[in-house]
Structure formats: structure tokens, C-alpha cells
Amino acid sequence: MPNDTQIIELRRFLAERLPQARLGIAPRRTAPDTLATGIEAVDQALGGGLPKGGFTELVAPGEGSGSAQFLHALLRHTAAAGRFLTLVDGADSLDVDALEPEALAHLLWIRCRSTAEALQTTDLLLRDRNIALVVLDLKLNPAHELRRIQGTLWYR
């Protein structure tokens, strides 16, 4: 068991090396590179935007929940910044008529026929690391296919 002198020396050493710990302040962590969505409230909630090269799950409760509007706003913002958005469309359901031609020019649209195909495609794209923003849309995929997705698949 350490004596009082050793404890005092340890505290002094830690205070010199980690002054923020003494003040009850957590060390500042470096934030991952983020890509702004163009929606101020969302960017603030996410600490600057979506993590670049990462995976973020957005869940929409159903029809009319705003997921298409979110995707359109994200695409417009990405295009305005001169970047590309990669959309893995799990049910080949994107309404391209609703998008502006300028935004479409910055969209890599991968049309899939099944949930499994969409997941494999997304996995390959995320491993590549050359694509800054990948969106996987499974909203219209059949529920029985979605229930077969293993929970561990989402961890990176």
C-alpha cells in the first residue's frame, strides 16, 4: 500500500502532466473530419456534420417523414461544395425528376435490386476511403430482408 508521500508525489506529477484533469475538464478530443449537411440544426447536433468516410444511420419513421427532403438538401449542399455524393439505393427508388440537374451532376447513383446487394456495395465503398460521402437508402426495402441484417454488420 502506498504511503502518504507517494500519493502526494503522484498527485503532483499528474497535476503537472494533466492540468485539465485537476480542473475537472475532459481532455479535448480531436473531432473526426466532418461533412456539413447544409442543414444548420443537423450540423450542430452532429458536431459539424456527418463523419467523413464513416457510417451514420438515419432512420425515418415512414412516409412523409422528410427523409427525401434531407437527401435532396444534402445532395444540393454537396454539389455546391464541388463534392460528390454516392447514393446506394437499396430498392432502386430514387425519383430523379425531383432533383435539379446541377445536383444530379454530383450524384453517383448505385441502383440495387436487394438489401444484400446494397449492403455489399456499401461495404465496398466504405472500405475504399476515396469516397467522402456514402448514403445507403433502405427505406423501401422489404421488412423481411431488413430483419435478416446482422447487428454486427453496422460496426466499423
Language model regions located:
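Detector for small/aliphatic-rich hydrophobic stretches
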Residues: M1-L87, A98-L104
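Short, solvent-exposed loop/turn segments at secondary-structure boundaries
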Residues: E145-I149
